[in-house]
Curated annotation (Swiss-Prot):
It is a peripheral membrane protein. This is ATPase synthesis protein 25, mitochondrial. Pfam families: mRNA_stabil, RsfS. Residues 1-14 form a transit peptide. It is found in: Mitochondrion inner membrane. The keyword RNA-binding does not apply. GO terms for cellular component: mitochondrial inner membrane. It comes from Saccharomyces cerevisiae (strain AWRI1631) (Baker's yeast). The lineage of its organism: Eukaryota, Fungi, Dikarya, Ascomycota, Saccharomycotina. GO terms for biological process: mitochondrial gene expression; mRNA stabilization.
Length: 612
């Protein structure tokens, strides 16, 4: 074997490394081997001496091995195939209660298939025993629980599920746990304050903000066949353990979270880090936000002085100079309201436009964030504005300025809000009582009633069917004898069909008064006889005193004689009506108008009852 070396070319000022190649000739095939050779040269002085150091390293290649950048594609394919296989096996193992509706199967396929939610469970709440009935049974028929990978996954799953329900079942889902942008920004501010406070206290707050933003629980009412869907992150699902709540009594032991004590919660971490240090607690109290008002008493007197003079520029300067916490702003608005109340009580003419703009200008987001204190205050202020100028601040303005505003800000309307609107409708004066003006008022009421759909009172009854609300609604349908809405009779029939024997005295009196106002005596007697109890049902509890007063105040001799001669008053004795002194006086006044004073009938009704 002959060996030939290709020597490098020697030149001056060369500072690079030269790579010599060695060629080996054999009788067989020719192979090329490379040796990495590093050569360094020095040209200082006259005598050029070079120092050469060689470091050789052989690189071996395996022709059959696939490079790493080609193996990525294969690994991704294997991973995707594994996910598909797991998905198919999960669908096979998906257990849905028997005799369940087809909608549950479609929703389950969407959650586990397209949305990729894990740990899918369905609880059938229809077959609960009577001994274990709770609030959970009243929610729906099926409870679905599944796990998402993150909070974004929860939110995206809710959006896709809502879109699916609208397309397939024409239903819009109701969700709890979905934070909008305003609530999310508020939560971030609270977390920032908590983080700053923790730094001042020497505590670590790295886990608090991160953990709170990484956990979520969405409870969705599909409004389809009583199906509820709970989408949770894994940690939140372990903490809440909803399976134990929804499971039957004989299966609750299967879902008991035995290792729940090992899962550290945020409050637990903070409690451990504080080490129950009393000094840290005192420092926290010293540095926490003060909740008392720091307004100057002289400022209140000056504000009242400017408001009584209706100098709104001076009042604005005082309010802006002393602006502070949410509690302080609420107290300032209360002071403005009390001043307006005094002026309206004195029947002074006030500039309603300026008073309204003053209240709106200082109703900031900090103030609205206290709904329990702000909205009752705004309602009372709106009633005062309507009392001061019903033409400017009418029922239409109240609908937009209060009801729609409160509803759009996510607050729940209450019974007092609807009553305030109906009272404003009745107080609003028109130039003439015409049918078209009555129709305009009715349109405002219809728009308001649409906002109160589904709202319940404290007695689990609808707000619309409240006794006072019904009375005001009937009064708003009648202006005088000639002007009335055609829907009055339909409303009365609907009230009778809805309540039946459970009609209250207030509802009956309101119906009688409105029928007497339009002088429809036939309908009035028809209503009165329709609610007459039979003799075997016991004592008659109808409002006899109000009925006789309505008839007597009509002044119609024909109607009065018809009531007396047809024997309507005899039912007082037949049904054992409790004759009070007020009822005795009403009977005497009615018989006196009919010309039967001191008659045998009066003695039979009044004196005979007193003797018993």
């Amino acid at each position: 074997m002959n060996k030939f070396c290709l020597l490098p070319f020697h030149g001056k000022r060369i500072g690079v490394a030269n790579i010599p190649f060695t060629i080996l000739f054999k009788k067989g095939p020719c192979f090329l081997h490379s040796h990495i050779t590093a050569v360094y040269y020095s040209t200082k002085g006259k005598n050029d001496s070079h120092e050469q150091s060689r470091v050789s390293k052989k690189s071996t290649f395996t022709p059959l091995e696939t490079p790493w950048y080609l193996r990525i594609v294969d690994n991704e394919k294997e991973l995707m195939e594994g996910k598909k296989n797991n998905h198919h096996t999960m669908n096979k193992e998906l257990e849905i209660p028997k005799t369940s509706p087809n909608s549950l199967r479609k929703i389950a396929d969407l959650l586990t298939g397209k949305l990729g939610l894990d740990d899918f469970l369905v609880f059938d709440l229809r077959k609960k025993s009577p001994n274990s009935v709770s609030a959970v049974n009243k929610l729906g028929d099926f409870m679905v629980i599944c796990t998402a990978r993150s909070t974004k996954h929860c939110h995206k799953s809710f959006l896709e599920l809502n879109k699916f329900l609208k397309h397939e079942f024409c239903s819009s889902a109701y969700v709890e746990g979905n934070f909008n942008e305003r609530q999310e920004s508020r939560r971030k501010r609270r977390l920032a304050r908590k983080s700053n406070l923790s730094k001042l206290l020497g505590r670590s707050s790295e886990c608090s903000a991160k953990d709170l933003n990484s956990e979520a629980w969405y409870m969705i009412d599909c409004r389809v066949d009583g199906i509820f869907v709970n989408i949770l992150t894994q940690r939140r699902r372990n903490e809440l353990n909803l399976e134990e709540l929804y499971a039957p009594e004989n299966e609750k032991s299967k879902f008991q979270n035995i290792d729940s004590g090992n899962v550290p919660t945020i409050s637990g971490v903070n409690e451990i880090s504080s080490n129950n240090n009393i000094l840290l607690g005192l420092r926290r109290l010293a540095q926490q936000r003060r909740r008392y008002s720091t307004i100057n008493p002289n400022g209140l007197s000056n504000l009242r002085y400017f408001l009584q003079k209706e100098d709104f520029k001076g009042a604005n300067k005082i309010i802006q100079s002393s602006s502070g916490t949410e509690t302080h702003n609420i107290r300032t608005l209360e002071h403005v309201k009390n001043t307006l109340k005094d002026l309206v009580g004195q029947e002074r003419k006030v500039d309603v436009v300026q008073w309204k703009s003053l209240f709106d200008e200082h109703s900031t987001f900090l103030t609205i964030n206290q709904p329990a204190a702000y909205w009752p205050l705004r309602l009372e202020y709106a009633i005062l504005l309507n009392k001061a100028d019903p033409q400017f601040y009418s029922d239409r303005v109240f609908l937009k300025d209060y009801l729609l505003l409160k509803k759009s800000l996510g607050q729940e309307l209450i019974r007092e809000d609807l009553i305030a609107l109906l009272e404003m409708v009745l107080k609003t004066q028109h130039s003439s009582h015409s049918y078209f003006n009555l129709v305009k008022q009715n349109r405002v009421i219809i728009r308001a009633l649409n906002l109160f759909k589904g709202l319940q009172t404290e007695d689990d009854g609808s707000v619309v069917y409240d006794e006072e609300v019904i009375s005001l609604l009937l009064n708003s349908m009648v202006a005088d004898e000639r002007v009335k809405l055609r829907s009055l009779y339909e409303t009365i029939d609907h009230i009778f069909q809805t309540f039946g024997d459970k009609l209250t005295s207030g509802m009956i009196v309101s119906i009688l008064q409105n029928l007497a106002k339009i002088k429809d005596w036939n309908k009035l007697l028809q209503v009165w006889e329709a609610i007459t109890p039979t003799e075997g049902e016991g004592q008659d509890k109808r409002p006899w005193n109000e009925f006789i007063n309505v008839i007597n105040q009509s002044g119609d001799s024909h109607v009065i004689s018809k009531i007396v001669n047809n024997g309507h008053l005899l039912w007082i004795r037949r049904l054992n009506v409790n004759v009070t002194p007020e009822l005795c006086n009403s009977i005497k006044a009615l018989l006196k108008t009919a010309g039967m004073e001191n008659s045998t009938l009066e003695e039979f009704l009044v004196r005979g009852t007193n003797n018993q």
